[in-house]
Structures are given as C-alpha cells and as structure tokens.
C-alpha cells in the first residue's frame, strides 16, 4: 500500500493556499506550490458548509484515496492542497480521480 506524505501544520496549508497557484472545477479546488524537497506532500480540507461531519470525512477520504491511487502521476517537489467545494458524498472514487487528473493537466506542472 502506497502511503502519502501529508501536510500536518497549519502554516504549511496557509503557505500553499496564500503563495501557491490554484485550479478548480465544480467539486474540487487544487492549490499547489513548489516545496524544494524533491517529494510531494498532500493536504486535504473540507468546508464546514458541508454540515455533517460524516459527509466531510467521506469527502476527505475520497480525496485522499484518489491521490494515493494516482501518486505516480503527480510531479515531484510540490505541495498540494485539495479542498472540497461542495458535498461530494454522491460521487464515486473514480469520478474524484478523473476530476483530480483533469486539474493536474490544467495546472500545467512539468513532471520531473
């Protein structure tokens, strides 16, 4: 099982969201920033506009699993923060994966 290197500190999330670039679609906003570490780190956030904690946790799990399954498609040396815009609990994991891959393509980050 591939394990993701996850952003843990609030300042790391803030740095990526403030200084980084973003691309978005209907369900997800992806922020990304070069981290000069030679490895990818991932962060996942869900808005409290999604009222139920169960639904927020499901959205977070969907995002995390989609990133884990496509880890090799992410360029090295970047921090990524994925934010769920709206309730994603009706989506399947494959739909979330497709959405994330489209965002990666739109971001035009060169894979090293």
From Swiss-Prot:
GO CC list: ribonuclease P complex
GO MF terms, alphabetically ordered: 3'-tRNA processing endoribonuclease activity; ribonuclease P activity; tRNA binding
Record-listed E.C. numbers: 3.1.26.5
PROSITE patterns the record matches: RIBONUCLEASE_P
Keyword Methyltransferase in annotation: no
Pfam families: Ribonuclease_P
Reactions it catalyzes: Endonucleolytic cleavage of RNA, removing 5'-extranucleotides from tRNA precursor
GO-annotated biological processes: tRNA 5'-leader removal
Keywords: Endonuclease, Hydrolase, Nuclease, RNA-binding, tRNA processing
Quaternary data: Consists of a catalytic RNA component (M1 or rnpB) and a protein subunit.
PANTHER family xrefs: RIBONUCLEASE P PROTEIN COMPONENT (PTHR33992:SF1)
Similarity annotation: Belongs to the RnpA family.
HAMAP family (alphabetical): RNase_P
Function: RNaseP catalyzes the removal of the 5'-leader sequence from pre-tRNA to produce the mature 5'-terminus. It can also cleave other RNA substrates such as 4.5S RNA. The protein component plays an auxiliary but essential role in vivo by binding to the 5'-leader sequence and broadening the substrate specificity of the ribozyme.
Name of the protein: Ribonuclease P protein component
The organism of origin for this protein: Pelotomaculum thermopropionicum (strain DSM 13744 / JCM 10971 / SI)
Phylogenetic placement of the source organism: Bacteria, Bacillati, Bacillota, Clostridia, Eubacteriales
Gene that produces this protein: rnpA
């Amino acid at each position: 099982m591939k394990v993701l290197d996850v952003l843990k500190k609030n300042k790391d999330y803030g740095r990526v969201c403030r200084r980084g670039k973003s691309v978005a679609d209907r369900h997800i906003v992806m922020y990304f920033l070069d981290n000069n570490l030679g490895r990818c780190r991932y962060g996942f956030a869900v808005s409290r506009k999604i009222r139920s904690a169960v639904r927020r946790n499901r959205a977070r799990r969907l995002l995390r699993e989609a990133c884990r399954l496509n880890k090799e498609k992410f360029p090295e040396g970047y921090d990524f923060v994925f934010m769920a815009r709206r309730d994603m609990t009706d989506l399947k994991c494959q739909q979330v994966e497709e959405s994330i891959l489209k965002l990666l393509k739109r971001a035009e980050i060169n894979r090293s």
